[in-house]
Amino acid sequence: MTCLILWYLWLISTFQLEFATASTANTTTTAKSGTSSSTEEPFPVLAVGKDGRGNYYVNSTFGTPGQRQRLLVDIIQPYINLVSGTSESHNEYSGVYHKHPSYLMNDSTSSVPVSPGQIYEISFIDGRAVNCTLVTDDMNFTNVSSENSSTALITDLMVTRDNVQFNSGSLSISNVSFFDIQSSNFKTSGLLGLSGKVTNPGNAIDSSQYTEQSYFLSLLKDADIIESSSYSLWLAGDTSTYKTYRDPISNCGKLLLGGVDPSLFTGTLGKFDLIPYVDPVSNAVSVGYPIVPLGPIYIVSNSGQSLNMTSKDFLSPALLDSTSSVSYLPTSTIIQIAVQIAATYVESLDRWLVQCSIADMGVSLGFRLRELTIEIPLRDLLSSTYDTSTNSSMFFSSGQEACFLTLYANTNTGVNILGEAFIKNIYMAMDLEDNTIAIAQAKKVEDDAVTEETNETTASTIIKKIKSGYIPYAKVMNSSNTRNLTLYPSYRSGYMFTVPGQLTAAYSNGVITGAGRSFYDTSRASTSARPSSTQFDSFSVSASEEWSNSTNRTSSASGAGVRLSSPYTFNKDPAGHVTRIASLLLLSIFSILIVL
């Protein structure tokens, strides 16, 4: 009898311990979750504007006293560049764009020249080139907001760490090294480089020869303002059309430093390893450029009907470029697109032209990146033919106004480049330490989640830190095919290869004359997405059939963080808890049998 009583006392104490363990584990996890959310530090967000030339920029000042500067958002090189106000840059043939403020080193009491007299000749991956000197000075971003994990704006903030000061309205960094452009082969203002570091020994662009002071994101990481050298970019506030392209927009985007804001994109955020770039001269390999695996390209009607403009298995590296107003694709792809939208090629202009009215027909191009499809409205690929010197535009012989198609053959660059039209329609995040990029369809400004402020916060809407090797909310989309890709530029011929005669036209006295094609050519009975079977396969851009390849339209990702619960909590009834209780019951029965 005594043994039986002792057994019951042991059994009761065991169950009490079991409940206590479960309760304690659950409370600890919840407390950690709450603490993490409440102590999340704010993220610096730079407001992005657009100037009258279509360039995306952030406002800043340099020097003491501060000299106002516009820095173009440049995701394909890693350095800060300013336009010098002295020396050769005053020459009208130097290529430097003087409508933006220039930097006067001698007017700044905090400026320090690095290696005085040395000229650095730097050539960028897209063909731009600058001659410049290296200078160290203080910089300050003047249009900055502070946002935390609850997506709330912070109005009373002051963070000072090392040489960085971050508060509501500004982000100041002292002793920043940058290139002072003396001359260039393109018109430019300052540049804010955001790419990874470049490997090219013996070349001025090689990053190993410069200190960490030369890298904007590295400076922020070293000061613990951001956790890793990373950023995300949203430019979908740019709602300009070919008619309003040159109208400046003071605030049309966000450059979020060190974090991801899920309220700025829709659908899946696809994550890719950056594709290596091989320098065609030195064969040096760099892995910090935003180069992605571009798959098939579709033209999509306003009802969702689509046609493949490439081939079923098309796969080629493509460079994302925020500074390019045009995109470069394979000649054959551009010809296929031209067939579908009745565009004509004018050799004397080396441009494709199309009736501007197609901008109102709801046509788009679908760019496939693995399982992800990014849709770019065709209206974003049009530019006006208006000439300010003649105060006139081009017209077709039918009387329809003509627009330029902002697509060029990649024979001009040697690489595929997805420019402004693509960038403004995506949300992108870069982890420069892990050499990865994440891309999603950008949420437009008319979407409620972007235009309306809310105090409600859920796990799938909070801003989260990018950590080395981790981009929040992203789904990995690599494959064995994409892992083997490298970008090795081909020969730049500088001209469009043979264009079929029926797609060409002549231009004279403001009028474009040529055969052209009808917008409503419906020569195919079925128009589901598939590779084009003939050179002139076509369909109606106002067709009514649904697009069969609409995966990204319906896909979604909550992005909610996963909390690992205790395996012994009772409200969830997990398998671990059930197994343990069953073991206790079996032990109890065995004990009773022994006592009896």
Swiss-Prot record:
Organism expressing this protein natively: Saccharomyces cerevisiae (strain ATCC 204508 / S288c) (Baker's yeast)
Keywords from the named record: Cytoplasm, Endoplasmic reticulum, Glycoprotein, Hydrolase, Membrane, Protease, Signal, Transmembrane, Transmembrane helix
Pfam family for this entry, one: Asp
EC identifiers of the protein: 3.4.23.-
Domain annotation Peptidase A1: ranges: 56-440
Leading EC class: hydrolase
Name by which UniProt lists this protein: Aspartic proteinase yapsin-7
Gene label: YPS7
Biological process per Gene Ontology, one example term: proteolysis
Catalytic site positions: 74, 321
Membrane topology: Single-pass type I membrane protein
Membrane-spanning segments: 576-596
Miscellaneous comment text of the record: Present with 149 molecules/cell in log phase SD medium.
Chain ranges on the Lumenal side, renumbered to this chain: 26-575
GO CC annotations on file: cytoplasm; endoplasmic reticulum; endoplasmic reticulum membrane; extracellular region; fungal-type cell wall
Compartment(s) of residence: Cytoplasm; Endoplasmic reticulum membrane
Gene Ontology MF term list: aspartic-type endopeptidase activity
Sugar-modified residues: 26, 59, 106, 131, 140, 143, 148, 175, 308, 391, 455, 478, 484, 549, 552
PROSITE patterns, per the entry: PEPTIDASE_A1
Signal peptide positions (record): 1-25
Record-stated family: Belongs to the peptidase A1 family.
